[in-house]
UniProtKB/Swiss-Prot annotation:
Belongs to the KAE1 / TsaD family. GO terms for cellular component: chromatin; cytoplasm; EKC/KEOPS complex; nucleus. Its EC number is 2.3.1.234. It is found in: Cytoplasm; Nucleus. A divalent metal cation binds at H114, H118, Y135, D320. This is tRNA N6-adenosine threonylcarbamoyltransferase. The keyword DNA repair does not apply. It comes from the Eukaryota. Its cofactor is a divalent metal cation. It holds the Pfam family TsaD.
Length: 361
């Protein structure tokens, strides 16, 4: 079976083609292409601008995936698309494209939960069996475990997502958004040496990041580190970003280092608590923030201390992509699931545990 997957819940537009061979052998990624809307330094991406980007690029990406996979529309069994969660306008622009392909190619639609797409792609690539999942991205922060054909949420953010916290601090420092603000924060953090104390807010298996963001924004302002320092965006490799401050004054690199260390410590704590609760020795990290090497390192230390292991994917599959939507969509399609055209509206707050996972025991 072949599926084409369309993802566009945020600023990344992805199209992928997945093959599930009829002989039951391992699924194959035939094509996985992506194009990112990059906003100017110091700014986030607005829904209307992101949707405009997706509309401009989606047909080109679909054509490119068909060429790379060396297939025709006749070979495709279903059209899978992200139905939520995400930003309304970008979601809708990709849903319209999916409906167009469904009508044009006369193929059934399969609406996919974005979070479930991340989980299923992570399970496929890493080979993890029944892990505790840490899902961390620009719009989501959840600790998840599978039970009784649902991906149950054991803990989550009480306000903003971890990726949103990192991205917004990148705006405060006027760090470049290319290739991604979180990535540039990570590169600066590697050069930081001074740990600045920040609010640490964990409540059971839930966490909060808004207070931490407010505190570090205030610190940056008090040390004159907020806003553009020159006519150009801050380069993570520039000496000005990492030079030691006077009288122990923290640098931008120190603030990025402190933010990462505090956030990731919170994530490790709630993940370990979930592991103890469900009795799992595996952790699967998914979502765009899951690419962060320091997060993987800290989680690995915790997991090994418990006699367990950590699984993560590289940027091809960790960052939003179309192939994860094709993978999750095909799993649902093979159980008989279809999304009628009249039920294909997007849901911005599509909960992970709202999906009936019929394809797992």
């Amino acid at each position: 079976m072949l599926a084409i997957g369309l993802e566009g819940s945020a600023n990344k537009l992805g199209v992928g083609i997945m093959l599930h061979p009829d002989d039951g052998s391992s699924p194959q990624v035939l094509a996985n292409v992506r194009h990112t809307y990059v906003s100017p330094p110091g700014e986030g991406f607005l829904p209307k601008d992101t949707a405009r980007h997706h509309r401009a690029w989606v047909v080109r990406l679909v054509k490119r995936t068909l060429r790379e996979a060396r297939i025709s529309p006749d070979d495709v069994d279903c059209i899978c698309f992200t139905q939520g969660p995400g930003m309304g306008a970008p979601l809708q622009s990709v849903a319209v494209a999916a409906r167009m392909l469904s009508l044009l190619w006369k193929k059934p639609l399969v609406g996919v939960n974005h979070c479930v797409g991340h989980i299923e792609m992570g399970r496929l690539i890493t080979g993890s069996t029944n892990p505790v999942v840490l899902y961390v991205s620009g719009g989501n922060t959840q600790v998840i475990a599978y039970s009784s054909q649902r991906y149950r949420i054991f803990g989550e953010t009480l306000d903003i997502a971890v990726g949103n916290c990192l991205d917004r601090f990148a705006r405060t420092l006027h760090i470049s958004n290319d290739p991604a603000p979180g990535y540039n924060i990570e590169q600066l953090a590697k050069k930081g040496k001074q740990l600045v104390e920040l609010p640490y807010t964990v409540k059971g298996m839930d966490c909060s990041f808004s207070g931490m963001l407010a505190a570090i924004d205030a610190l940056a302002a008090s040390y004159g580190l907020d806003g553009p320092q020159s006519d150009e965006a801050v380069d993570a490799n520039s000496p000005a970003a990492v030079e030691a401050g006077e009288n122990g004054k923290p640098t931008r690199a120190d603030l990025c280092f402190s933010l990462q260390e505090t956030i990731f410590s919170m994530l490790v704590e709630i993940t370990e608590r979930a592991m103890a609760h469900v009795g799992s020795k595996e952790v699967l990290i998914v979502g765009g923030v899951g690419c962060n090497e320091r997060l993987q390192e800290m989680m690995g230390i915790m997991a090994r201390d418990r006699g367990g292991s950590v699984h993560a994917t590289d940027e091809r599959f960790c960052i939003d992509n179309g192939i994860m939507i094709a993978q999750a969509g095909l799993l649902a399609y093979k159980t008989g699931f279809r999304t009628p055209l009249k039920e294909s509206a997007c849901t911005q707050r599509f909960r992970t545990d709202a999906v009936f996972v019929k394809w797992r025991d």
